């Protein structure tokens, strides 16, 4: 409707300790605020934050420490969106995912009163979502119509172009065999309907098109959002 500025996932953030970050090969010099500034926005401009899921590398940037050292939402004017079943899943984590669901990323949002739940496939945000359960319970994949194209925010169903082959799944998947099935069905539809995939974890391939090959669905072309749609 032209009145919303929607952010999908927020990355790691910067509130964790140096020891925490030392376990991960962080790449690049941008943080969320500098990236927003580059795009001409401020964190206060964000009206909605959609979490594909609540693993720390997807939602950590939603929370900051204030001057008193307390946790608070980084986007004071935003509504935060998740799936109700996934939110509960993250609050009562299984042993496999407990280290990925950090209370400091979850509870401050709930306590802020800014939390909203996606109730069905068509959200009031103006785009569809696909629900996937292989990586984690009720992962959301936003499906966005833009300039005549369908863009799917592939999140951790297909985090990089290297994960396009059906058997290549993430070690973090809680139900890897289900991921195989979900990927197979999704990629079949994606190539048939000429979807573009936005790859959240791929430093080399931001936006990709797909093609059928003898070995299955593979990368066709790689683009940046700016070059494909214009800045």
Where in this protein do the model-derived segments appear?
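Conserved beta-strand hairpin/beta-sheet module of binuclear metal-dependent hydrolase folds
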Residues: 1-34, 38, 141-156
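Short acidic/His/Gly/Ser-rich catalytic and metal-binding motifs that mark active-site loops
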Residues: 8, 14-18, 89-91, 160-165
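Active-site metal-binding loops of divalent metal-dependent hydrolases
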Residues: 10-13, 54, 85-86, 134-136, ...
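Cap/insert and terminal regions of metallo-dependent hydrolase folds
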Residues: 25-34, 147-231
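Metallo-beta-lactamase
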Residues: 27-41, 45-57, 74-131, 136, ...
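Metal-dependent catalytic neighborhoods of phosphoester/phosphodiester hydrolases
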Residues: 59-70, 209-212
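Active-site glycine- and acidic-residue-rich loops that bind
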Residues: 59-63, 130-140
